[in-house]
């Protein structure tokens, strides 16, 4: 009898557990209600008394998907030109998380004061539409790419030691703008990065850019080869899949543009590689290439490695140039 009671108790316990978990698994999950609205309605809600720049990634992604929802409890991140009259009043507006920026006529970039110790800079050259004083970037993915590369990194010299501006930085910026217009995010490398690192300037020589292979625009290369680009193709070496390096010219200025490739080691670690400058066939390998930062060279914004000393040491290993790192 005792055995029968134990067996009955065991079966009842199993039955209760099965019923309980079946109830959990079959009960629909009730998600928090989301008030979906037209994106124009959301932007109308965000309209400000003075011009502002929408820099909130979540809202920008909603606009790009054309699937917006109202979150009145969340502060939306906006950029505000701090020189505007009454700009300080937006700090008290519960709708906004305000990030002040400086828009100097002497530079080609906007400078954001994220915190006391954190500065970010993005190019001024981006298309936007205005909705109720809210400036909304047209190419949202490009704008987000600008912001992801916006952490400011200064060179090693003190400001009072930096040489006077030269036309070289203007020429370099013009070349960079053409690449950006073609959907790429070029960054300085080679001796151009080295010159910035040790002198905070650029020099009249053949400049050096790199572009991630995954970010390279094949249509740009095709237009170059057809002579349908603002740039002139001077030389091409290798293929896109195997260390492509090209030399391009804008007026009298030339630049090498190399591709940076990503690979996985057998242990799963990431390495990057490119082919050497001057069309040499040797391969230059880098440890995991870090996120990119921005820097100012005589009023122009350029993207660079966030650890330039490490990158220079890897690229110029066993040469005299590592003395500067």
From Swiss-Prot:
Keywords noted in UniProt: Membrane, Transmembrane, Transmembrane helix
InterPro entries on file: FKTN-rel (IPR009644)
Subcellular location(s) per record: Membrane
One Pfam family per UniProt: W02B3_4_N
A single cellular component GO annotation: membrane
Signal peptide segment: none
Residue spans crossing the bilayer: 10-30
Membrane topology label: Single-pass membrane protein
Predominant location category: membrane
PANTHER family noted in UniProt: FUKUTIN-RELATED, PROTEIN CBG15246
Protein name, UniProt field: Uncharacterized protein W02B3.7
Organism: Caenorhabditis elegans
Taxonomic placement: Eukaryota, Metazoa, Ecdysozoa, Nematoda, Chromadorea
């Amino acid at each position: 009898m005792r055995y029968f009671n134990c067996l009955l108790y065991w079966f009842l316990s199993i039955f209760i557990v099965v019923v309980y978990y079946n109830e959990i698994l079959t009960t629909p999950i009730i998600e928090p209600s989301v008030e979906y609205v037209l994106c124009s309605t959301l932007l109308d809600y965000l309209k400000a008394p003075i011009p502002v720049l929408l820099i909130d990634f979540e809202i920008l992604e909603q606009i790009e998907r054309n699937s917006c929802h109202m979150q009145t409890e969340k502060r939306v991140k906006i950029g505000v030109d701090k020189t505007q009259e009454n700009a300080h009043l937006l700090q008290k507006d519960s709708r906004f998380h305000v990030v002040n920026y400086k828009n100097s006529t002497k530079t080609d970039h906007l400078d954001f004061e994220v915190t006391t110790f954190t500065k970010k800079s993005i190019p001024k050259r981006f298309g936007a539409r205005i909705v109720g004083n809210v400036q909304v970037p047209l190419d949202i993915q490009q704008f987000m790419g600008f912001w992801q590369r916006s952490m400011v990194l200064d060179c090693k010299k003190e400001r009072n030691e930096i040489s006077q501006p030269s036309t070289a930085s203007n020429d370099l910026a013009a070349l960079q703008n053409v690449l950006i217009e073609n959907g790429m995010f070029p960054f300085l490398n080679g001796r151009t990065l080295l010159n910035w690192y040790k002198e905070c300037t650029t020099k009249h020589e053949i400049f050096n850019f790199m572009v991630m292979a995954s970010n390279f625009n094949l249509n740009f290369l095709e237009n170059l080869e057809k002579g349908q680009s603002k740039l002139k193709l001077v030389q091409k070496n290798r293929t896109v899949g195997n260390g492509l390096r090209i030399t391009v010219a804008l007026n009298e200025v030339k630049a090498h543009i190399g591709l940076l490739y990503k690979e996985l080691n057998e242990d799963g670690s990431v390495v990057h590689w490119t082919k050497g400058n001057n069309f040499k066939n040797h391969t230059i390998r880098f440890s995991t290439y870090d996120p990119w930062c921005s820097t100012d060279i005589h009023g122009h914004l350029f993207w660079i490695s966030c650890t330039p000393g490490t990158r220079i040491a890897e690229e110029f290993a066993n040469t005299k140039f590592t003395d500067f790192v």
